[in-house]
Amino acid sequence: MLCLGWIFLWLVAGERIKGFNISGCSTKKLLWTYSTRSEEEFVLFCDLPEPQKSHFCHRNRLSPKQVPEHLPFMGSNDLSDVQWYQQPSNGDPLEDIRKSYPHIIQDKCTLHFLTPGVNNSGSYICRPKMIKSPYDVACCVKMILEVKPQTNASCEYSASHKQDLLLGSTGSISCPSLSCQSDAQSPAVTWYKNGKLLSVERSNRIVVDEVYDYHQGTYVCDYTQSDTVSSWTVRAVVQVRTIVGDTKLKPDILDPVEDTLEVELGKPLTISCKARFGFERVFNPVIKWYIKDSDLEWEVSVPEAKSIKSTLKDEIIERNIILEKVTQRDLRRKFVCFVQNSIGNTTQSVQLKEKRGVVLLYILLGTIGTLVAVLAASALLYRHWIEIVLLYRTYQSKDQTLGDKKDFDAFVSYAKWSSFPSEATSSLSEEHLALSLFPDVLENKYGYSLCLLERDVAPGGVYAEDIVSIIKRSRRGIFILSPNYVNGPSIFELQAAVNLALDDQTLKLILIKFCYFQEPESLPHLVKKALRVLPTVTWRGLKSVPPNSRFWAKMRYHMPVKNSQGFTWNQLRITSRIFQWKGLSRTETTGRSSQPKEW
C-alpha cells in the first residue's frame, strides 16, 4: 500500500508539472553578453515577488529603510528548496534543469552557468518544490534569458570577469559590461557579493580603500537597459580574488635535501622532488627531472606534477621519478631536479649509493644464523656423539683386535656374593646382568668375547695370579659397581686392573654404576681416584635392558672396535685357548689356595 501511495503522489506531481500554468508567474528579462576571448560564468536567482516571497518564506516585511540581509532565497531554508525548469521554444512540457543540462548547476535557489553560449538562451522558471497551499501554485518566477556574444570591439580595455585585488592596497572592482563607460554615462548598478545585496554601491565600480581577505568572492552587477518597446536587466558576474604581490624569489627545493640517497639494488625506487613557488599572477611553474651520465644529460619522462599544498603566498608542487629496479648503472648516474619560475631556476642533484646498512644487516644475520646453526649442530652432535661414532666404526674403522695378542675383548667383574639387600629385583640383579644380559647383547648380537669367571673358569675357584693373568689378556675391564662390590672381596679385581692399566695402555677400564653406593673409608687411594676419572655408564634398570637402549650404545662406544663378521671364528679360537689354560691351571695349582690373596 505504501508503494502504491508513492506511485500515486508521483503521478499527481507529474500531472501538476505537465499542467503547470506559467501565465501567473512574474516575468523578468535578463541579458548576458559574453566575451568570446575569455571564460566567464553566469548566475540566475530565483527572485520571487515580494507578496509571494513573504508568504512562501514566512518572513516579516522590512521597512523601506531596512536593507534585506540576504539576496532572495539565499538566506532562507525554505527558498533553498526550489525547483528550476526550462521552457522549450517549441511549446513542449517544462524540462527539469538537473536532468537535461549538465553544464548548469543548481546551488540552493541559484543557477550557475559554467560555460557561455547562445544555446543558453531561453525561458527559465523557478518555483517551490513543495506546494503547501493554493497560493503557492502561482508562486513562481519566469526569467527570459538572452545570451549573445559581445560585438562592441571599440572598448579595448574592458574589465575582466576575473579580477585580482592586492592585499593591503587600494583597489576597485569594475562591472565588465560597463567598464568602458564613464561614471556620468553609467546607469545605476545593483551589486551583490556571494548572494548578499550591497545596497550602498550603485556605480559601475566598487572602490576598496584597503583590501582584506574578506573582499574575495563572487560579485554580480545588474543594471537596466530599455528601449521604446521593453526593458531588461543586463547582468555580469565577476570572480574576485585577493592576492599578495608577485614573488621576487626563485623557487626553492624542499626535497631532496641531501645530495646522496642510499638504495637497495634490485628494488623499485621513487625519488620525489618537492618545490615551493612564490605567488605570481601569471603562474607558470616548471619542474622537471634530468639524468646526467658522464658528459650526457637528458630529460626524463615522468608523471605529471601535482600540487600538494597551496596558500595565499606560495604553492608546493611535487613531481616524482620512478625506477622499476635500481641497477649498478643507476649508481653511476646523477638525478637532477630542475625547477623554474619567472625569476629564475634552482637545481638539486641526487647520487644513488648502495645501502651499507643492508649489507651489514645481511652479514649480521648470516653470522647469527651460522652461529645458531653451529650451536644447534654442536648440541645435536653432543647428544648423538656415541651413535655417530658407532656408525662411523661400522663402515670405516678397522678391527683394533688384530695382532694385539689378547684373547678377550672384556673381562667382566661383579659381586659374587651379597651381604647388602639388593635394590633390584632378582631378575635384574648384578649376576643376571653379568651372566645373562652381557652375553646376550655383547657376545651374541655384537660379536665381542667376554671372560666371565663363573662361566668360563672351572669350579674350584682361581688364585689372585690367575685373575691378574686373565685381566692382562683382556682388552677391556668391565666392573659392575654396587654396595656389595665396593664392600666385598671383588674390589680386589678392580684394584688389580687399575694397577695393570697404568702399565698397559691397551687395557681400558669401564665402570658400570649398577646402583647407588657410598665409598667405604677402607678403599685404597688409587681405587678412589679411579672411581672419579674412569668412564662410567649408569644402569637405569628396566629402561636399560633393551639392546637398542642408550646403555648398550655407551657400552659399545667404550668397547674396542671389532669386525663383527668374524666373531664366530674368534669365539671358537678363544674358547679353545680358555680350555687349554684351564687344564694348565689345574696341574699347577697343587698346594695353592683357591681364594685371592690379600692386597
From Swiss-Prot:
Residues 378-599 are cytoplasmic. It is found in: Cell membrane. Its EC number is 3.2.2.6. Residues 20-356 are extracellular. The chain crosses the membrane at residues 357-377. Disulfide bonds join C46-C126, C155-C180, C175-C221, C180-C221, C273-C337. Induction: Induced by IFN-alpha and IL12/interleukin-12 in natural killer (NK) cells and T-cells. Changing Y212A: Abolishes binding to the preformed binary complex of IL18 and IL18R1. Impairs IL18 receptor signaling via NF-kappa-B. The TIR domain mediates NAD(+) hydrolase (NADase) activity. Self-association of TIR domains is required for NADase activity. This is Interleukin-18 receptor accessory protein.
